[in-house]
């Protein structure tokens, strides 16, 4: 059921009172692969500390729909988020299948889909005021396709986007019109809410 949920919905949730060995789960999901380390380390605690937060996720602020780490090459394909103890009352994790949303978007907004397929967006993490400074930049279209013109990934993380490559004013307007139509579309697509 766990794998079927990942294949069908793009995620799976395990509710248990047991303390799990996260490395066993990762090795079971992706045998013979080592988990990818990030700027935060291989694993890390997310602790709500507004005064010293180096990431919006470390606060109690609402996070808009996004994908984590789009500036990595390659970006993570499977993420394991493990909540041992929720520090705050309330709050919710909202998950969306952006791949499915992109397929629906292509049907409803074919011109805008093509624009987001053809224009390059810059995803970046530039942060020097930290113990391990980072300057990561990755350029990708929002709707990434392979050589056979098949959609293989949706790149969506508005709050880590940098400048788009130079384009003329008409193209710039066209891009941002499509961008905001996609933003509204993804906001309205069905989602799953996980209460922690």
Per-region residue spans from a language model:
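Active-site environment of non-heme Fe oxygenases that use a 2-His-1-carboxylate facial triad
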Residues: 1-195
């Amino acid at each position: 059921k766990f794998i079927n949920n990942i294949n069908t919905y793009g995620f799976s949730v395990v509710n248990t009172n047991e303390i799990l060995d996260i490395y066993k789960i990762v090795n079971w999901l992706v045998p013979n692969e080592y988990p990818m380390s990030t700027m935060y380390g291989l694993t890390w605690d997310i602790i709500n500390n507004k005064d010293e937060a180096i990431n919006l996720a470390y606060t109690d602020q609402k996070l808009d729909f996004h994908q984590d780490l789009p500036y990595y090459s390659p970006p993570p394909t499977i993420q394991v988020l493990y909540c041992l103890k929720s520090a705050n009352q309330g709050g919710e994790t909202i998950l969306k299948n952006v791949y499915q949303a992109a397929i629906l978007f292509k049907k409803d907004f074919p011109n805008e889909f093509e624009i987001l397929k053809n224009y390059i967006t810059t995803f970046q993490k530039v942060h020097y005021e930290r113990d391990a400074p980072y300057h990561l930049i990755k350029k990708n279209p929002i709707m990434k396709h392979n050589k056979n013109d098949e959609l293989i990934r949706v790149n969506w993380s508005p709050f880590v986007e940098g400048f788009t490559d130079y384009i003329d004013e008409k193209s710039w307007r066209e891009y941002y019109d499509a961008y905001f139509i996609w933003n509204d579309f993804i906001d309205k697509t069905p989602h799953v809410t996980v209460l922690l």
